[in-house]
UniProtKB/Swiss-Prot annotation:
CDD domains: Ribosomal_L1. One of its GO terms (cellular component) is cytosolic large ribosomal subunit. The keyword Transport does not apply. Coiled coil: none annotated. GO terms for biological process: regulation of translation; translation. This is Large ribosomal subunit protein uL1. Keywords: Repressor, Ribonucleoprotein, Ribosomal protein, RNA-binding, rRNA-binding, Translation regulation, tRNA-binding. Part of the 50S ribosomal subunit. Binds directly to 23S rRNA. The L1 stalk is quite mobile in the ribosome, and is involved in E site tRNA release. Protein L1 is also a translational repressor protein, it controls the translation of the L11 operon by binding to its mRNA.
Length: 234
């Protein structure tokens, strides 16, 4: 049997895996247990009452968190003409067409988000095997294929998170950093829950938001008592 590290023993002793924690209590506990030498992210897992095997019950989208994610995001944009200029003015680090595609084909991918105007998809389409496996392929469902590339760049910079359920019907994303104030983490979580509720498939039956858990990058998951979340109750 693998030997528990000191950190794992502390987590085991502090976290009650049978309990659903009030959001403020959960955040305080995560902050206490976040002892890594870097500022850990606060990640969320939301178990949805969907059948992920059915395409009409898959949940996918994007939302801008009110307090951002705490990450500095580098944005690449495929656009030309006025759209290219607008993307640059909005703060995109990389803007281009075939020249940008050539960089990516060479393995030069110093960016976190890729946005494309619809007329640029003829170029982006060649990059599916490179961008797809990395979760970077632009998609209209999450607002990264859009005629308004400037707005998409601003959203990405402002702390937009993209979400998509896995094969078990669970959404995994981040809601900030462990050094955020508790109120900001709570409001970010509630904003995500509102977005997920709006994205509820019409064919999903029964309880939709089944379970919410928070964790830090290096920490254990803490189940959240949903009754303390305004977005769930209302």
């Amino acid at each position: 049997m693998a030997k528990l590290t000191k950190r794992m023993r502390v987590i085991r002793d502090k976290v009650d895996v049978t309990k659903q924690y009030d959001i403020n209590e959960a955040v305080a506990l995560l902050k206490e247990l976040a002892t890594a030498k870097f500022v850990e992210s606060v990640d969320v897992a939301v178990n949805l009452g969907i059948d992920a095997r059915k395409s009409d019950q898959n949940v996918r989208g994007a939302t801008v968190l009110p307090h951002g994610t705490g990450r500095s995001v580098r944005v690449a944009v495929f656009a030309q003409g006025a759209n290219a200029e607008a993307a640059k003015e909005a703060g995109a680090e990389l803007v281009g067409m075939d020249d940008l595609a050539d960089q990516i084909k060479k393995g030069e991918m110093n960016f976190d988000v890729v946005i494309a105007s619809p007329d640029a998809m003829r170029v982006v389409g060649q990059l599916g095997q490179i961008l797809g496996p990395r979760g970077l392929m632009p998609n209209p469902k999450v607002g990264t294929v859009t005629p308004n590339v400037a707005e998409a760049v601003k959203n990405a910079k402002a702390g937009q998170v993209r979400y998509r359920n896995d094969k078990n019907g669970i959404i995994h994303t981040t809601i900030g950093k462990v050094d955020f104030d508790s109120d900001k983490l709570k409001e970010n979580l509630e904003s995500l829950v509102v977005a997920l509720k709006k994205a509820k498939p019409a064919t999903a039956k029964g309880i939709y938001i089944k379970k919410i858990s928070l964790s830090t990058t290096m920490g254990a998951g803490v189940a959240i008592d949903q009754s303390g979340l305004t977005a769930v109750v209302n």
